[in-house]
């Protein structure tokens, strides 16, 4: 049984890496010494015996090269181990396979048994008092779901452990061909010096060594080493780029540092906003170098560009669409959109007075650059609470941490710099101050901040459930969450929907439209019997639990499945509820389309 301890494994890997590096250093020195003998001038060492000896040491140079390649492969493998564990999310894990396969498995079975016995005992008790006080037995559905989830996690951990173990052993075995070749090639080198008492370097037969079957494999071994080291080098480069990009996303406000990292990552590996930001900072530095603006302004522009660039990809959208949820992290009560706007506008006004009216060259350049970027991308469209944050409204309205890691890859920041000709220059004593009409910018920020969405544009989300009684061969269950606007009112349309598992997304209508295309447009797909799928209200309530069902069955059993409500009681008689359901249905099928795309 395996015992996996990440700390010990990484400690030993680091220790062994250092040992291999020391061995490599010694091999390089040894190779140098061999080459010095092999390259002795004829004036120093000549004759047939001397030539044989020099050729013999030249052969040792080749063997030493093979050793260095092998050591490099070992170092590359050991150095990448921490990243391998991190990718497997096991960089700090301690796992005993026997515990997972025996103790936990037994505990799972025992827990199920105990719950079953307790439920049976409770049922007997309730039956005894049923004539006095009829009571329903408690549900074990939630318990079973959580127990099943825990057992699933146990099994996945075992699989992950075995996969990691197999992957590491497989990669470690990559050096075995090199090791075998070195041993056999070195043996052949020794044998080429003769036999018995005549086995000395002076009798070395270079031709016999070069033409031996084992030595002819040298080229293949070198290609193998080169290919492996090339892959490991590329992996290391990708990890470095990933770490540097994370650093850019986390926050680098110094222009010099931002440019240095951007160039190291390579513009081709940056997000569009990061490329734009790097280019703009370079332009600002060029102007500073030409003496057109001061370094304080350059630094302010750089920070402002970083501010707006980061906000563009983290977004005011999330904050505005659900201010209550976002602000609750700060201990605030849920806020009405009007109050949200009041908070934003107050923050904008305060930052304007602080950084523009009473600021210096640095703060003014930063504020204007930020403001232009905010207006250019229409604050609420792709920016967010982080945007207000960067205009020094930060702590007042946004929990920055809740926005981390979100990206909008297709955002392109326009020309944000304050000296761009398309913006008006504000003049002081008839001298261009290198800023735009900031008062007008402030007004535009306030105008955009009024466009507060209400949460109805956010895509639906669905969380899978596993009720024990569900026929899992035919259906899945999802808790759908979302909001729609019906007759001017924002309505929460969250509900459970039981989804058919045999929908063929490639099935076509008579007009050649696939089910996936239908769903993308918000329309119901077709079942395999050729009838369109109906969303049936199980308890005839809107909103309420629903079932996907072929229209053929919906029609066939209509009298049975609609007995809960009379025609006069149908929610469809309520204009708001009817509009609410129609909006839900369209948005729901779009969610299903996205779900199918993610699965494939």
Swiss-Prot record:
Residues 12-40, 141-176 form a coiled coil. It comes from the Bacteria. It is found in: Secreted. It holds the Pfam family LXG. PROSITE patterns: LXG. Disruption phenotype: Deletion of the yobL-yobK operon has no visible growth phenotype, however it is out-competed by wild-type cells. Keywords: Coiled coil, Hydrolase, Nuclease, Secreted, Toxin. One of its GO terms (cellular component) is extracellular region. Residues 1-235 form the LXG domain. InterPro entries: Bact_secretion_toxin (IPR051768), LHH (IPR026834), LXG_dom (IPR006829). GO terms for molecular function: nuclease activity; toxin activity. Induction: Expressed on rich and minimal solid media likely in early stationary phase; not dependent on DegSU. Not expressed in liquid LB, but only under conditions that promote biofilm formation. Interacts with cognate immunity protein YobK but not with non-cognate putative immunity protein YezG. The interaction inhibits the toxic activity of YobL. In the N-terminal section; belongs to the LXG family. This is Toxin YobL. It comes from Bacillus subtilis (strain 168).
């Amino acid at each position: 049984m395996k015992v996996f301890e990440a700390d010990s494994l990484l400690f030993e890997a680091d220790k062994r890496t250092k040992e291999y590096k020391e061995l490599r250093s010694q091999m390089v020195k040894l190779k140098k010494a061999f080459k010095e003998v092999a390259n002795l001038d004829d004036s120093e060492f000549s004759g047939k015996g001397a030539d044989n000896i020099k050729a013999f040491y030249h052969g040792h140079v080749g063997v030493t090269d093979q050793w260095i390649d092998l050591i490099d492969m070992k170092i590359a493998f050991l150095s990448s181990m921490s990243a391998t564990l991190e990718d497997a999310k096991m960089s700090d894990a301690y796992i005993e396979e026997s515990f997972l396969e025996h103790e936990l498995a037994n505990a799972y079975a025992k827990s199920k048994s105990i719950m079953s016995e307790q439920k049976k005992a409770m049922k007997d008790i309730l039956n005894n008092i049923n004539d006095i006080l009829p009571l329903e037995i408690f549900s074990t559905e939630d318990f079973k779901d959580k127990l099943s989830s825990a057992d699933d996690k146990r099994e996945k951990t075992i699989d992950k452990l075995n996969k990691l173990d197999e992957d590491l052993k497989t990669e470690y075995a990559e050096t075995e061909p090199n090791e075998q070749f070195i041993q056999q090639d070195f043996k052949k080198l020794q044998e080429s010096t003769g036999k018995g008492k005549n086995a000395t370097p002076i009798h070395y037969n270079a031709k016999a060594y070069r033409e031996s079957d084992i030595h002819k494999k040298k080229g293949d071994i070198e290609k193998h080493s080169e290919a492996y080291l090339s892959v490991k080098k590329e992996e290391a480069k990708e990890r470095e780029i990933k770490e540097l990009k994370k650093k850019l996303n986390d926050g680098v406000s110094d222009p010099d540092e931002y440019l240095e990292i951007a160039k190291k990552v390579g513009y081709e590996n940056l997000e569009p906003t990061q490329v734009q930001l790097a280019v703009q900072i370079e332009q600002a530095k060029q102007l500073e170098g030409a003496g057109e603006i001061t370094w304080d302004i350059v630094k302010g522009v750089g920070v402002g560009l970083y501010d707006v660039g980061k906000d563009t990809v983290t977004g005011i959208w999330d904050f505005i669409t659900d201010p209550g949820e976002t602000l609750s992290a700060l201990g605030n009560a849920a806020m009405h959109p009007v109050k949200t706007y009041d908070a934003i506008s107050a923050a904008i006004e305060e930052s304007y007075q602080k950084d523009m009216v009473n600021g210096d060259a640095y703060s003014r350049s930063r504020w204007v650059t930020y403001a232009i970027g905010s207006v250019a991308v229409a604050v609420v469209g792709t920016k967010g609470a982080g945007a207000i944050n960067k205009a020094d409204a930060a702590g007042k309205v946004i929990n920055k941490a809740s926005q981390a890691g979100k990206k909008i890859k297709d955002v392109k920041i326009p020309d944000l710099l304050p000296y761009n000709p398309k913006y008006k220059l504000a003049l002081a004593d008839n001298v261009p101050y290198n800023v735009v009409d900031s008062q007008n910018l402030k007004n535009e920020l306030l105008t955009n901040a009024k466009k507060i969405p209400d949460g109805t544009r956010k895509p639906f989300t669905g969380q899978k459930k596993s009720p024990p009684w569900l026929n899992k061969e035919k259906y899945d269950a999802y808790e759908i969450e979302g909001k729609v606007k019906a007759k001017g009112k924002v309505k929460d349309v969250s509900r459970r929907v039981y989804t058919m598992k045999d929908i063929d997304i490639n099935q076509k209508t008579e007009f050649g439209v696939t089910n996936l295309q239908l769903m993308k447009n918000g329309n119901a797909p077709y079942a395999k019997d050729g009838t369109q799928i109906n969303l049936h209200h199980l308890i005839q309530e809107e909103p309420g639990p629903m079932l996907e069902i072929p229209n053929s069955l919906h029609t066939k059993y209509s009298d049975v499945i609609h007995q809960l409500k009379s025609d006069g009681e149908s929610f469809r008689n309520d204009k708001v509820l009817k509009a609410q359901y129609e909006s839900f249905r369209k948005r729901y099928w779009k969610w299903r389309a996205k779900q199918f795309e993610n699965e494939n």
